[in-house]
Swiss-Prot record:
<dbReference type="InterPro" id="IPR002676">
    <property type="entry name" value="RimM_N"/>
</dbReference>
<dbReference type="InterPro" id="IPR036976">
    <property type="entry name" value="RimM_N_sf"/>
</dbReference>
<dbReference type="Pfam" id="PF01782">
    <property type="entry name" value="RimM"/>
</dbReference>
<dbReference type="InterPro" id="IPR011961">
    <property type="entry name" value="RimM"/>
</dbReference>
<keyword id="KW-0690">Ribosome biogenesis</keyword>
<keyword id="KW-0963">Cytoplasm</keyword>
<dbReference type="GO" id="GO:0006364">
    <property type="term" value="P:rRNA processing"/>
</dbReference>
<comment type="similarity">
    <text>Belongs to the RimM family.</text>
</comment>
<feature type="domain" description="PRC barrel">
    <location>
        <begin position="98"/>
        <end position="170"/>
    </location>
</feature>
<comment type="subunit">
    <text>Binds ribosomal protein uS19.</text>
</comment>
<dbReference type="GO" id="GO:0005840">
    <property type="term" value="C:ribosome"/>
</dbReference>
<comment type="function">
    <text>An accessory protein needed during the final step in the assembly of 30S ribosomal subunit, possibly for assembly of the head region. Essential for efficient processing of 16S rRNA. May be needed both before and after RbfA during the maturation of 16S rRNA. It has affinity for free ribosomal 30S subunits but not for 70S ribosomes.</text>
</comment>
<protein>
    <recommendedName>
        <fullName>Ribosome maturation factor RimM</fullName>
    </recommendedName>
</protein>
<dbReference type="Pfam" id="PF05239">
    <property type="entry name" value="PRC"/>
</dbReference>
<dbReference type="GO" id="GO:0042274">
    <property type="term" value="P:ribosomal small subunit biogenesis"/>
</dbReference>
<dbReference type="GO" id="GO:0005737">
    <property type="term" value="C:cytoplasm"/>
</dbReference>
<dbReference type="GO" id="GO:0043022">
    <property type="term" value="F:ribosome binding"/>
</dbReference>
Length: 171
């Protein structure tokens, strides 16, 4: 089964089973809503424990969660420094707006110019604030391609292919 990180359990909080989460998702409200089911992975463990969110609140830069049936610090302590993940099935497209994609859909795509020349493969995405920048590993060097309308002309996630307009100085 393919898993995707949505948060890291950095510590416990209090004695009533709250855990302190550092979010790694763009969809915090949806992922950490009361009643949602997540997979909790203990540190250095490959086997998940299914958890259901019982309560959620913000505290400083963290999200504090409690899980159903785990209302004691002793029950959540083993998950400290672990990860919270969702399955690919839980990554629904209704969270995305038009021309938005999940990172896992873009990473691994082959980038080609409008003329058909292969530029490389997307191996990372940098979030710069203004727009995302794709790190494309070419045969000789890495290229940084901004995800903007003037450059990215077509994205086919099924075929894992992206067509870009190569502006002067881009590569």
């Amino acid at each position: 089964m393919e898993w995707f990180n949505v948060g890291r359990i950095v510590n416990t909080h209090g004695i009533r089973g709250e855990v302190r989460i550092l979010s790694t998702t763009d969809f915090e409200k949806e992922r950490f809503a009361v009643g949602n089911k997540l997979a909790a992975f203990k540190k250095d463990d490959k086997k998940p424990t299914g958890v259901t969110i019982q309560s959620v609140r913000r505290h400083k830069n963290f999200i504090l969660l409690t899980f159903e049936g785990m209302n004691n610090i002793n029950l959540v302590e083993p998950f400290k420094e672990g990860l919270l993940k969702v399955t690919k099935d839980q990554m629904t497209d209704d969270l995305l707006e038009e021309n938005e994609f999940f990172f896992h859909e873009i990473i691994g795509c082959t980038v080609v110019s409008e003329e058909g020349e292969t530029i490389g493969v997307v191996n990372d995405i940098l979030q710069t604030g203004a727009n995302d920048v794709w790190v494309v590993k070419g045969s000789k060097k890495e290229h940084y391609i901004p995800y903007i309308e003037d450059i990215v002309k077509d994205i086919d996630v099924d075929e894992k292919k992206i067509v870009i307009h190569v502006m002067e100085g881009l590569l």
